[in-house]
Amino acid sequence: MEKKDLKPAGVFHYFEEICQVPRPSKKEEKIIAYLKAFGEKHKLETKVDEAGNVLIKKPATPGMENRKTVVLQSHIDMVCEKNNDVKHDFLTDPIETEIDGEWLKAKGTTLGADNGIGVATELAILADDSIEHGPIECLFTVDEETGLTGAFALKEGFMNGDILLNLDSEDEGELFIGCAGGIDSVAEFTYREVDVPAGYFCCKVQIKGLKGGHSGGDIHLGRGNANKLLNRFLSQASQKYDMYLCEIDGGNLRNAIAREAHAVIAIPDADKHALRTDLNVFAAEVEAEYAVVDPDLQFVLESEAARPKAIDKDTAKRLLQTIYAAPHGVYAMSQDIPGLVETSTNLASVKMKSGHIIRIETSQRSSTASSKQDIANMVRTVFEMGGAAVSFGDGYPGWKPNPHSEILEVAVESYKRLFGVDAKVKAIHAGLECGLFLDKYPALDMISFGPTLQGVHSPDERMLIPTVQKFWDHLLDILKIGRA
């Protein structure tokens, strides 16, 4: 199978086209310009708000003008993650895609099907006048991945739809009618620089090969967190050796489970062989623990040039102890929906910043507002006990399920008629923009669906090609039969 043969042709044409347009979160200028040019080319009413959200309107098929207006919605930014051995500039370089069996993936980077496939689907509908539908508004939001900025900034009256179809879900055959709310917590330690004594061996301890994944959709899988595993070894080593912590870095994005982390440490030269032995023993133990969910986990120890400075011992001790104690993963399962995570927390990243600051970013999610605040307060308490300054982001609301939704009834009936099986109606632990849309447009009738994606927010991201056709057929049928 070659890319030019992929079906539906229009969707994959536009997906490949937008893969040529850099669109990192908060750097969406090029894709916004692309969308404006697209609207002008097709002579469609197009507008952009102050945040950068784009709305393109398409009139109804003749005879369908009295149908309810449907908003098709996707976000235009993408998570930019790459493997360490891959050279790629997300600000300038296109995403290189390739076919692997029935899957489409990128070459060592995130694919951007989250949510590029939704964007491409909307463009294909806007460009094809043979598709039957009532009035359509295509909403393209900015910066979903790092703060839901576009959804927060959306003003009342920018769109005028009655129904909203969010195209940002990742399991074909599943219709989502609810999502978790979330909040970000940031802890900062201030440290002093101290001298590393002469005669100390300096080395880098690195963890890589973890699958990572989405901190909402994949948190229940029990995959390893590179920050937690690295910290576990460093804590062990610090108790055995006179260890200086010179550098620490792990994870990147608040909504991704950390895949890689490293630290540079210094210990007495006489202990370097024992340290390597300890790491080998530790690696064997942890690799056995994660053999099923993270079979490619690796620990690497490499010699480093001598570092003259390190984090002061007191701060380093408090940092390691606090990260060790900080919760990560599933905290509670839903009592209403079997198999749904209710509350979780993600220890996302550990970074050294200018001004002698070590910054730890975490994110908390819950379908219950009080539980979301409870788990955030738990994280805050742990870090404050360790002497860190803690701050919270604004947070965002969840989307309460409406099992009596009219558009849900249409989508369920359509799926059964097209494919002979029942669609699964679900809520999702990941955050969607839908909760914020309801704040501004409380009368909206909404569902979320999409083709099958795996490994989103990581270079393992891939899209199951046959599900794109099913998603497309289902969406067009909903637009055709949608009730007036």
Give the residues covered by each predicted segment.
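Acidic/His- and Gly-rich active-site-bordering loop/insert found
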Residues: 2-103
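Midchain, well-structured core segments that form catalytic/ion-binding scaffolds
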Residues: 22, 102-105, 145, 152-365
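Short, conserved charged micro-motifs
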Residues: 65-66, 269-278, 369-375
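Zn-dependent metallopeptidase/amidohydrolase metal-coordination segment
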Residues: 7-11, 342-355, 363, 419-478
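Acidic, glycine-rich active-site loops and adjacent beta-strand->loop/helix elements
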Residues: 76-78, 139-147, 169-172, 211, ...
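Active-site metal-coordination/substrate-binding segment of hydrolases
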Residues: 64-146, 151-162, 202, 313-316, ...
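His/Asp/Glu-rich mid-to-C-terminal helical/loop segments that flank catalytic regions of hydrolases
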Residues: 157, 223-240, 269-272, 317-324, ...
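Substrate-recognition/cap regions that form aromatic- and gly/pro-loop-enriched pockets
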Residues: 340-430
